[in-house]
């Protein structure tokens, strides 16, 4: 179960790196802003700085999970699991906030929250 938990944490981290790329690098490209239900190029430009900041938030969560995975495998499980649970727990809570924002966000919240949920649950079960 440890391996499964860490694989789900890795997938969650990679997804959050992808989200970072969209929010902080390609936000003003039509394909990206349409993904986030932005309705115009002008609105994408207006929200660019907010998305840029949010993207880095997602990147830092991903880095925390990745460093945690490495620490577990490098023989520092206390440090590693602390980082994995903290990072994936934050990803999961952010997905719950997104889901609570309205029905139109449920799909995005499920995509964002499923892998960190599995990482946390399987990690807890593995460590019991």
List each language-model region with its residue ranges:
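N-terminal signal-anchor transmembrane alpha helix
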Residues: 2-26
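Hydrophobic residues within alpha-helical transmembrane segments
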Residues: 7-10, 14, 56, 89, ...
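Transmembrane helix-loop junctions in multipass membrane proteins, especially transporters and channels
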Residues: 24-32, 73-77, 103-107, 124-128
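Cytosolic, membrane-interface loops and tails of multi-pass inner-membrane proteins
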Residues: 25-47
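Interfacial helix-start motif at the membrane-water boundary
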Residues: 42-60
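Core segments of transmembrane alpha-helices
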Residues: 54-67, 115-116
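Transmembrane helix-loop-helix
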Residues: 67-96, 100-114
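Small-residue-rich segments of transmembrane alpha-helices in multi-pass membrane proteins
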Residues: 113-128
């Amino acid at each position: 179960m440890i391996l499964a938990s860490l694989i789900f944490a890795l997938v969650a981290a990679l997804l959050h790196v992808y989200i970072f790329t969209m929010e902080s690098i390609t936000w003003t490209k039509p394909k990206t802003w349409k993904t986030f239900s932005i309705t115009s190029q002008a609105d994408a430009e207006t929200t660019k700085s907010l998305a840029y900041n949010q993207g880095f938030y997602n990147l830092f969560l991903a880095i925390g999970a990745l460093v945690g995975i490495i620490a577990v495998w490098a023989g520092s499980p206390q440090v590693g699991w602390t980082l994995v649970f903290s990072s994936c727990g934050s990803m999961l809570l952010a997905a719950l906030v997104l889901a609570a924002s309205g029905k139109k966000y449920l799909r995005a919240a499920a995509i964002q929250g499923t892998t960190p949920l599995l990482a946390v649950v399987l990690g807890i079960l593995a460590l019991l």
